[in-house]
Design a protein with these regions (language model features):
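Conserved Class I S-adenosyl-L-methionine
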Residues: 47-49, 173-189, 193-276
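Conserved catalytic/acceptor-binding region of the Class I
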Residues: 121, 128, 136-209, 233
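Conserved alpha-helix/loop element of class I SAM-dependent methyltransferases that forms part
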Residues: 17-38, 53
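Class I SAM-dependent methyltransferase SAM/SAH-binding core
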Residues: 39-99
Length: 276
């Protein structure tokens, strides 16, 4: 049985500016919410740095961030409490694979989390059902899993040296996304839509700084299952990281102004029809 990946909030936040930009782009496509004040759920909230942005857009909202990682929730506590606009921000433990709302929400949103949840598209009907009339379901997932950073990770996990320890999916088990057309098809089947689902993709051409920045990036996300699997063997962990680092250096050579790291992301926004 695979151990659940452990998370390091500080490592994840090392590239917070690049990781946060897609959420701003997602928020820009969300219409005003029906509730006064609105009730909002953030699925897979991580350390809370993105969740707090919801209170900037809707200052009087009651926002709850849900995550399955105790370490991430502990980091998120620094944002918890009453908000300047008269709303409230709190956090709770929940696994997105099983979370079913116990109340009505005006917005259910998820940023860069559902790729870890196998079959997450099957959860859409239950989440949508718990939207208020005029409410919105919106999410963003990485769509970068065929890029060198992720493909090389999977290939290395399946190499003879690592296959017995890592070849059962530790390097690839997070690839649970659909292509944009797949999300459009699933969301279009939801009842009572206000309009056609808004689904799109964007490739962010990022310039990362520092030594081996792509390796540093993946340590916060894609490498987490591998690092968890090798946590009790520091020598093996170091050897794996050295091999992966060398592959990444060839795939993403450093330039005079940094390392170019393109990253594709997939977005979707769907709105329920308001009561007439």
């Amino acid at each position: 049985m695979q151990a659940a990946a452990t998370w390091d909030p500080q490592q994840y936040l090392r590239h917070a500016t690049h990781r946060t930009r897609p959420f701003h782009d997602l928020l820009a496509r969300i219409s005003e919410l029906p509730g006064h004040p609105p009730r909002i759920a953030d699925i897979g909230c991580g350390p809370g740095n993105v969740t707090v942005l919801l209170t900037h857009r809707w200052p009087d909202a009651h926002v709850t961030g849900y995550d399955s990682s105790p370490d991430m929730l502990e980091a998120a506590k620094s944002y918890e409490g009453a908000t300047p606009g008269g709303g409230r921000l709190d956090f709770a433990h929940a696994d997105a694979a099983h979370w079913t709302p116990d109340q009505t929400y005006d917005l259910i949103v998820s940023n860069a989390a559902l790729q870890w949840v196998q079959g997450h598209a099957d959860r859409f009907p239950a989440w949508y059902e718990h939207l208020a009339p005029g409410g919105t379901l919106a999410f963003q997932v990485p769509g970068n899993f065929t890029s060198p950073s992720h493909a090389l990770l999977g290939e290395l996990c399946d190499a003879p040296q690592w296959r017995d320890r890592l070849g059962d999916g530790h390097g690839r088990r997070f690839i649970h996304i659909l292509e944009p057309a797949g999300y459009l098809e699933r969301l279009s089947g939801l009842p009572g839509l206000a309009d056609e689902p808004d689904v799109w993709k964007t490739t962010y051409v990022q310039l990362l700084q520092g030594e081996d920045p792509v390796l540093d990036w993946t340590k916060g996300t894609a490498l987490r299952p591998v690092l968890t699997a090798l946590a009790d063997d520091s020598a093996a962990r170091g050897e794996f990281l050295a091999q992966y680092r060398d592959l990444l250096r060839k795939a993403y050579p450093a330039g005079p102004r940094g390392t170019v790291f393109p990253f594709r992301r997939i977005f979707a926004v769907v709105r329920k029809k308001a009561v007439q």
